[in-house]
UniProtKB/Swiss-Prot annotation:
Keywords: 4Fe-4S, ATP-binding, Cytoplasm, Iron, Iron-sulfur, Magnesium, Metal-binding, Nucleotide-binding, RNA-binding, Transferase, tRNA processing, tRNA-binding. Pathway: tRNA modification. The gene is ttcA. The keyword RNA-binding applies. It comes from Legionella pneumophila (strain Paris). GO terms for cellular component: cytoplasm. A motif (PP-loop motif) lies at residues 37-42. This is tRNA-cytidine(32) 2-sulfurtransferase. The lineage of its organism: Bacteria, Pseudomonadati, Pseudomonadota, Gammaproteobacteria, Legionellales.
Amino acid sequence: MSSNPSSVEKKLLHYTGKAIADFNMIQRGDRVMVCLSGGKDSFTLLTILNQLRIKSGNKFEIFAFTLDQAQPGWNDACLRQWLAEKSIPHEILTRDTYSIVKEKIPEGKTYCSLCSRLRRGIIYRYAEENGFNKIALGHHRDDLIRTLMMSILYNGDIRSMPPKLLSDNKKHIVIRPLCYVQEKDIITFASEQAFPIIPCNLCGSQENLMRKKVASLIDQLAIENPKVPSNMLHALQSLKPSQLMDQNFWNFKNLEDGLETAQSIQCEEVFNAQEFEIEDEKI
């Protein structure tokens, strides 16, 4: 920890430490690979995790991994210098995913899905080859609630970014230690620390992304009620299956079995769901 930490730094240490404890993200002896993209979120994650590592008495390891995706204008000279000054073990790996994305995705369409899929495969492979059992990502509270809103509005399902996840290849645990942290605090901290931010020109050139629209919507609602963002985060931790409609999690069809009646009631379906199927149409 800094000799004289600012109020926002104390706040970040508190909420990151709380998330790690709440979800048992890091255990003694873990080798944690922190994905450092060069953005404010990942710089903050690496800095705070490094301070918590020192505070713990080095009970776990951290390693910074940066993927150079060969985007035009990429310059990691300042990033390399910063990592060297902090004495954080690291590697910057170059893989040209940029050309693949540009080739596969039509102009004007969102690159995020393919780009993240390619990046994820490289990250998992690197972690496996180098013996890292935990992969830390820099998603924060606002990322989680925006993803929730996007899933509901555009995909028709209720999902977000879990704080802790078993990787697709079942060989790693992915953690998001900043899941309680507000983006505005990260912005303040990044400014205080003067991180050598590397902009993502690939994403920044697409102004019409759904995520920006959803972020704007949540911000507008928060003007009227500042508790909206925290309420949305709380909703992710307070699921009530009986108040929803997913029959995989609640046995709506046979609720009659729980009735307290003097005599048992024989339940027989009047309608069959197949009678009401409408092909290729969503209610």
